[in-house]
């Protein structure tokens, strides 16, 4: 065998004396050590081919090219006569990747990071990349305050040049902040400044935001908060000179020192606007008006810039540039703002597209749009479309993206990206409710029927005191102008005595239809007609019931429990809704007002009217809308007409999971007062002329309920389910009263409360959990009443299935 000559042994060294400057002609190329990589693939990566004349530079380039493929750990090129012999050692193939000891970082996140670095099962292993990954992960742990953390990549060889890769984590504990010092502050105390930070050296029990665990990212945010605090108060020359973070020897404690220069306070002297204002100079200048002498404020400058961009966006200028340059006059301590505006090009909308609506038809989404194709782009119109899609309640999330059309200087496409949620359910089963006992339920409810936007429901309930069935359907776009049409038919067999109400049974059925007329983006008026037949029996007349029967000319016996009558009523139904909530379910911002009313029309056996008003307002207290304050009210009032009273079975009730939690359902308010009484009533005798109090709730013709809730992130729930679960702490208050109640001497002598007094307010406080389950919204609450009256029944734990209010 001819002696083999070593040409080059590494990337960084080549021998220029082996072949001389002229080199030699390659007749053939042979490989040694190839296993997974095909010969053809290796040859294609080389710059040398048989027949080429090669020299030292060509050999160096060949080695570099083979290394660049990422398939080889070692490459050597030798000459055997006129043949190039390429000896390679392939990198091992990754057979599996596992993790151990990682608690702060999830496996999925680690896999994504590894894949982004080219480390995945089936690929070759680059040990250099592993070292970078180890260091990068350790740097991550250091950034969140875990300075004792270590990450080690363990490679286990397997047959056929394969390896198992295991990343072993030792996370350690988070270093806690021992002290935060601010040096150079004179205008504000250190405690006052630190109170605006997320990082704290002391965290009171009530502070749910502060944290003693050091994180580099949070420190950067706190430094920006500190800068904004000063800039918003006129300190235009404020500067953070340096920041020192010191670690204790045991790596468990952190000391932070922030050195600052406050400077003096500066006032605004004026604003000068220049640039391409696109013909909207008057509107832009109105946004930049200031009161001379006002303190300089960085946040006001940012707000002004955002206002200008938003204004131009409404006129089709999708990408305006607004830059503010402060001119600081140190002599008189003033700042003049120079605002330069470049409106840029004006854009048309070529197309509006929807992504993610696998169930909902495009037409259902498109009819909610206020931005039109072929028209100037209006950022406010695009945002209105997003708001309207959110309020439908069909989607978990709605995002918008304005994309420039390639090759066009003045066209964009608007893309709405939605994530659909389950808007329907089918259920059949047996359950137990704290307010209804054993319950049998069957139903189909679909708020977006076959993706058409129709709401269709077939529901039935059977429990201890009620048998109910209903079919309903609503077309939200009965006309192209957005007039809605809805209707329902129902049957209800209700035994009030079994529901802890006064004694009567009501079998009713009816039908109604309603048209909804949109007034503008946020207001809708409703009008409709209804018919209901009520067949009452097993009535044991109590005072309020007796009063009603007398007003309609019906007679009843105090000695009989089998009084009864039937009534047919036709009603004109009306309503108004104002809705500016940010989404249809689990809102976090905005308000909703809902007014409903009905009044009987000629041909009815009864003559009365009834009104209810519901309000809800959400106030987010953080930018992510995870912490929200919710205020709710419910008001109700009804009365008779033409000398008649409103039917007792139309009364308002309070208590239970939808009104005042912690009290038994419908238990708040007036109680039945019977003539003569029965064995369960508080009577000294069975004298028919005597009135006897009881614990049977009868409701009233007036109601007021209020609630204040603090919505918080739900512990132990991942971000994936954050939009499906809601936790809140609440305070509820409410009362029901009877404006027609006569507080006579006989009633007072019998110890009966004055049920016409609206001041008998009940209160409770507790915690609630809501879950958007496949069966519908499930609401669990635990409440403790802290203001109640004789006869009230408590029920601390409650749950129900139904719509959130």
Swiss-Prot record:
Function: Part of the outer membrane protein assembly complex, which is involved in assembly and insertion of beta-barrel proteins into the outer membrane. Constitutes, with BamD, the core component of the assembly machinery.
Family: Belongs to the BamA family.
Stated name of the protein: Outer membrane protein assembly factor BamA
Residue spans crossing the bilayer: 425-433, 436-446, 455-462, 466-475, 484-495, 505-506, 523-535, 564-577, 591-600, 609-619, 629-639, 701-710, 725-737, 763-772, 774-784, 799-803
Highest taxon listed in the record's lineage: Bacteria
Chain ranges on the Extracellular side, renumbered to this chain: 434-435, 463-465, 496-504, 536-563, 601-608, 640-700, 738-762, 785-798
Segments in the Periplasmic topological domain: 21-424, 447-454, 476-483, 507-522, 578-590, 620-628, 711-724, 773
Cellular location(s): Cell outer membrane
Family matches, as PROSITE patterns: POTRA
Subunit structure: Part of the Bam complex, which is composed of the outer membrane protein BamA, and four lipoproteins BamB, BamC, BamD and BamE.
Residue ranges of domain POTRA in the record: 24-91, 92-172, 175-263, 266-344, 347-421
One GO CC annotation: Bam protein complex
One GO BP: Gram-negative-bacterium-type cell outer membrane assembly
InterPro entries: Bac_surfAg_D15, BamA/TamA_POTRA, D15-like, OM_assembly_BamA, POTRA
Gene name tied to this protein: bamA
Pfam family, one: Omp85
């Amino acid at each position: 065998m001819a002696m083999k000559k070593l040409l080059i042994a590494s990337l960084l060294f080549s021998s220029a004396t082996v072949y001389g400057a002229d080199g030699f002609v390659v007749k053939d190329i042979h490989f040694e050590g190839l296993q997974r990589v095909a010969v053809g693939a290796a040859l294609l990566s080389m710059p040398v081919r048989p027949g080429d004349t090669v020299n030292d530079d060509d050999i160096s380039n060949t080695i570099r090219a083979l290394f660049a493929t990422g398939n080889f750990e070692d490459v050597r090129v030798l000459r055997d006569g006129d043949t190039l012999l390429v000896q390679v050692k392939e990198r091992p193939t990754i057979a599996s990747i596992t993790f151990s000891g990682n608690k702060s970082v999830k496996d999925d996140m680690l896999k994504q990071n590894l894949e982004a670095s080219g480390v995945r099962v089936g690929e070759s292993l680059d040990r250099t990349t592993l070292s970078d990954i180890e260091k990068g992960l350790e740097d991550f742990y250091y950034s969140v305050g875990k300075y004792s953390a270590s990450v080690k990549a363990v490679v286990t060889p397997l047959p056929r040049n394969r390896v198992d890769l295991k990343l072993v984590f030792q996370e350690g504990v988070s270093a806690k902040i021992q002290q935060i010092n601010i040096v150079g502050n004179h205008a504000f105390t250190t405690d006052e400044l630190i109170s605006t930070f997320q990082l704290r050296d002391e965290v009171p029990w009530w502070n749910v935001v502060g944290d003693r665990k050091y994180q580099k990212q949070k420190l950067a945010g706190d430094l920006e908060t500190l800068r904004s605090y000063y800039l918003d108060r006129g300190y235009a020359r404020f500067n953070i000179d340096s920041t020192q973070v010191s670690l204790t020897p045991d790596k468990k404690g952190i000391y932070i020192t922030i050195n600052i220069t406050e400077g003096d306070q500066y006032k605004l002297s004026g604003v000068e606007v220049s640039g391409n204002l696109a013909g909207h100079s008057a509107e832009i200048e109105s946004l930049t008006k200031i009161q001379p002498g006002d303190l300089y404020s960085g946040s006001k400058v940012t707000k002004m810039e955002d206002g200008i961009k938003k204004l131009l966006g409404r006129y089709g200028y999708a990408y305006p540039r607004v830059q503010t340059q402060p001119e600081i006059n140190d002599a008189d301590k003033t700042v003049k703002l120079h605002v330069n505006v470049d409106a840029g090009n004006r854009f048309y909308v070529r197309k509006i597209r929807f992504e993610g609506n696998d169930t909902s038809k495009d037409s259902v989404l498109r009819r909610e749009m206020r931005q039109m194709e072929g028209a100037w782009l209006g950022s406010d119109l695009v945002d209105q479309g997003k708001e309207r899609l959110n309020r439908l309640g069909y989607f978990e999330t709605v995002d918008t993206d304005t994309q420039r059309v390639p090759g066009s200087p003045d066209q964009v496409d608007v893309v709405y990206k939605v994530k659909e949620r389950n808007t329907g359910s089918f259920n059949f089963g047996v359950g137990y409710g704290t307010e209804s006992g054993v319950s049998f339920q069957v139903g189909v409810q679909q708020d977006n029927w076959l993706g058409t936007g129709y709401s269709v429901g077939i529901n039935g309930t059977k429990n201890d005191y009620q048998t109910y069935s209903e079919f309903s359907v609503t077309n939200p776009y009965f006309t192209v102008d957005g007039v809605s049409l809805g209707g329902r038919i129902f049957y209800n067999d209700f035994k009030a005595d079994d529901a802890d109400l006064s004694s009567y049974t009501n079998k009713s059925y009816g039908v109604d239809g309603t048209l909804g007329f949109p007034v503008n983006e946020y207001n809708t008026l409703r009008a409709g007609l209804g018919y209901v037949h009520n067949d009452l029996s097993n009535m044991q007349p109590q005072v309020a019931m007796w009063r009603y029967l007398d007003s309609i000319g019906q007679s009843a016996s105090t000695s009989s429990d089998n009084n009864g009558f039937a009534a047919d009523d036709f009603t004109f139904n009306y309503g108004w809704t104002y809705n500016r909530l940010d989404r249809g379910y689990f809102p976090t911002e905005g308000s909703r007002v809902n007014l409903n009313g009905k009044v009987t029309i000629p041909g009815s056996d009864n003559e009365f009217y009834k009104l209810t008003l519901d309000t809800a307002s959400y106030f987010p207290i953080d930018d992510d809308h995870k912490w929200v304050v919710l205020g709710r009210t419910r008001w109700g009032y009804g009365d008779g007409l033409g000398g008649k009273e409103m039917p007792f079975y139309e009364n308002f009730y309070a208590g239970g999971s939808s009104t005042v939690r912690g009290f038994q359902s419908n238990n708040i308010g007036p109680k039945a007062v019977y003539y003569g009484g029965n064995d369960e009533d508080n009577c000294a005798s069975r004298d028919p002329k005597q009135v006897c109090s009881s614990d049977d709730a009868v409701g009233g013709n007036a109601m007021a309920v209020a609630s204040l809730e603090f919505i918080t992130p739900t512990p132990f729930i991942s971000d994936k389910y954050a939009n499906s679960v809601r936790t809140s702490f609440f305070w509820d208050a409410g009362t029901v009263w009877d404006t027609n109640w006569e507080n006579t001497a006989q009633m007072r002598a019998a110890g009966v409360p004055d049920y016409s007094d609206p001041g008998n307010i009940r209160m409770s406080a507790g915690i609630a959990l809501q879950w958007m389950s496949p069966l519908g919204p499930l609401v669990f609450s635990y409440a403790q009443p802290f203001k109640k009256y004789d006869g009230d029944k408590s029920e601390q734990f409650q749950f129900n299935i139904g719509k959130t209010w």
